[in-house]
């Protein structure tokens, strides 16, 4: 699990290499919402500000491997970042790591209790307890975005050498 949590490159690229054509993204929800207080603090958003919040599953066929939550402030969605608001079932990492590497400003890893997740997210996670997660603060063209990824038990069946 450690190599997944501490992957320094594109998690999307690594999963695609390991899963091939079976890799896919399912959007759980996406829309403007109030970020969690700790997310707003990391993104330096003023109280009450909304951001684009996107929650997805990264999967191999129907098997859920990773749950991801991205928070993109409105300022990040301007100019070249406009395309980030219209990803559909495309993975954020595909855009984030395209051409120039994004700048990572912070990284955190921790065990996350699934009891804090919404029931719709928790259902079918395959988790019977805490899962490893990581959170990274990136910037694209000087504008921030926050990405959190939670590694579900099924990710252990994906070859780590990919």
From Swiss-Prot:
It catalyses: chorismate = 4-hydroxybenzoate + pyruvate. GO terms for biological process: pyruvate biosynthetic process; ubiquinone biosynthetic process. It comes from the Bacteria. One of its GO terms (molecular function) is chorismate lyase activity. Its EC number is 4.1.3.40. It is an enzyme of class 4 (lyase). Pathway: Cofactor biosynthesis; ubiquinone biosynthesis. InterPro entries: Chorismate--pyruvate_lyase (IPR007440), Chorismate_lyase_/UTRA_dom_sf (IPR028978). Substrate binds at residues 54, 92, 149. Its main location: cytoplasm. Belongs to the UbiC family. Removes the pyruvyl group from chorismate, with concomitant aromatization of the ring, to provide 4-hydroxybenzoate (4HB) for the ubiquinone pathway. HAMAP family: UbiC. This is Probable chorismate pyruvate-lyase. It comes from Methylococcus capsulatus (strain ATCC 33009 / NCIMB 11132 / Bath).
